[in-house]
């Protein structure tokens, strides 16, 4: 309760002047506050309506934070009806609505000093001017309640952050990353001329994977040994996936649930989930609008 509200609540029983002296506020300030009451009521009603919209968006996956919820609210809105991110943040705090936060990850990169190494062609610059030019990939573990793990291999396009290819299995042998890169080839039609960047895990330095890359026309690139920042884009994707699917839990109840939830999430990631890199657009939408812009310019 504010001091002004205290005065308002007791002014029928006591003199306003005396109440203002007790709570140490000026009478003019109290009357100004009182005159603004209708405007405050209008703002409170608008905030309540906005809170309902925010909760409806958040409840779709219980993972979205202020930036993506703000983008969702403003998507297609009239310029005069756009919502400021600070207002969204304030209402989310008041309503105790929050996105999910990162958790620590288990190390899955095990370098094999006996295998080949290749240079770092990206130098931590994961951007690309067009789709299908630069890809990054990694393997991450997916914990299951019985103590086992599934493993997910990813191929992410640096232009749009689209997950172009992925594979999931009970092992992290070289076949897993070969399947993921093949899935990306199927998505794009061809990977000829593209760069694929990874860490120095034994799977990525294997002869079998090198031969598969050559067969697809892909040039390999690798970051420094033991430096996660050299593959930060893939690491960030893995952390986001587990944060938004496990939602604070430690493991999936079984393999079937794990596979189903990961499939649902990666589908939503590409088609519906707003990405800050893409100007708060989903990756596929970002690519489509880029292609449309090029056609108009031609």
Predicted regions and their residues:
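Charged DNA-binding/catalytic regions of mobile-element recombinases
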Residues: 1-298
């Amino acid at each position: 309760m504010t001091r002004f509200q205290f005065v308002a609540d007791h002014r029928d029983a006591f003199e306003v002047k005396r109440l203002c002296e007790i709570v140490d506020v000026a009478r003019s300030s109290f009357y100004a506050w009182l005159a603004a009451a209708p405007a405050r009521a209008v703002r409170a009603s608008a905030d309540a309506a906005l809170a309902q919209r925010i909760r409806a968006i958040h409840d779709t996956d219980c993972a979205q934070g202020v930036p993506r919820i703000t983008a969702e609210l403003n998507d297609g809105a009239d310029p005069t009806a756009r919502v400021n991110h600070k207002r969204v943040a304030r209402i989310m705090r008041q309503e105790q609505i929050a996105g999910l936060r990162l958790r620590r990850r288990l190390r899955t990169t095990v370098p094999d000093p006996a295998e080949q190494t290749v240079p770092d062609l990206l130098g931590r610059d994961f951007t690309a001017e067009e789709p299908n030019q630069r890809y990054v990939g990694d393997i991450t573990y997916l914990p299951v309640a019985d103590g086992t793990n599934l493993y997910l291999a990813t191929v992410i396009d640096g232009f749009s952050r689209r997950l172009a290819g992925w594979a999931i299995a009970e092992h992290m042998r070289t076949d897993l990353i070969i399947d993921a890169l093949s899935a990306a080839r199927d998505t794009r039609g061809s990977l000829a001329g593209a760069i694929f960047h990874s860490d120095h895990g034994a799977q990525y330095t294997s002869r079998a994977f090198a031969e598969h890359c050559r067969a697809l026309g892909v040039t390999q690139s690798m970051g420094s040994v033991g430096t996660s920042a050299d593959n930060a884009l893939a690491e960030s994707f893995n952390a986001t996936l587990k944060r938004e699917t496990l939602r604070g839990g430690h493991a999936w109840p079984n393999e079937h649930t794990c596979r189903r939830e990961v499939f649902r999430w990666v589908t939503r990631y590409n088609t519906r989930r707003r990405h800050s890199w893409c100007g708060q657009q989903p990756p596929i939408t970002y690519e489509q609008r880029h292609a449309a812009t090029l056609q108009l310019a031609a």
